[in-house]
């Protein structure tokens, strides 16, 4: 597993993660994204950048924000439990070779742990963008997964440093897929 903790090295590791995303997209796979609270908003920004043009006109790219549909989230939470809100969707929508992109600002939510386990069951690579030094996520990741750890103490500061503001999705993802 690749793990990064120094902010100055984030761009090259974001590039590494983007190569996995590009590879999945070029193989007709999709990106599933999730996060809780403010991280759900960051997940939505990534999804928008993929589905709609980002800085220039180009074809839409397949991305599903698992945190976006409040009716689905509340139905799953009501009928099952809150811990299942992402994993249940991933089990229905995810396929081997897809990417699960997780934004987590430092909390240790059980719903994130469950979606990681579900991703591994379906052979979906996890890219986790985290902000917690001793969190729950890191031990759950496999060798094929990628963790980009933004080592900041404040969840607001972590949101400020999210990859959307650091050219994520990177230019090569936007250019390479548009050329297909």
Report each predicted region and the residues it spans:
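Short glycine/proline- and acidic residue-enriched helix-loop micro-motifs
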Residues: 1-5
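A short, well-structured juxtamembrane/interface segment
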Residues: 6-27
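N-terminal hydrophobic or amphipathic segments with adjacent small-residue motifs
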Residues: 22, 29-32, 37
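Glycine-rich phosphate-binding loops that contact phosphosugars or nucleotide phosphates
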Residues: 32, 39-40, 44-179
């Amino acid at each position: 597993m690749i793990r990064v903790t120094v902010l100055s090295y984030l761009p090259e590791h974001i590039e590494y993660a983007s190569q996995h995303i590009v590879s999945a997209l070029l193989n007709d796979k999709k990106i599933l994204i999730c996060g809780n609270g403010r991280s759900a908003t960051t997940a939505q920004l990534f999804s928008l950048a993929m589905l709609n043009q980002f800085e220039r006109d180009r074809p839409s790219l397949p991305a599903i924000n698992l945190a976006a549909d409040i009716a689905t989230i509340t139905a799953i939470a009501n009928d099952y439990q809150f811990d299942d809100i992402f994993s249940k969707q991933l089990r229905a929508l995810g396929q081997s070779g897809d990417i699960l992109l997780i934004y987590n600002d430092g909390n240790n939510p059980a719903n994130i742990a469950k979606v990681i386990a579900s991703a591994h069951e379906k052979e979906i690579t996890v890219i986790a963008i985290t902000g917690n030094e001793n969190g729950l996520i890191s031990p759950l990741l496999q060798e094929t997964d990628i963790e980009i750890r933004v080592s900041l103490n404040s969840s607001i500061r972590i949101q400020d440093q999210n990859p959307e503001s650091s050219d994520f999705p990177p230019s090569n993802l936007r250019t390479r897929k548009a050329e297909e």
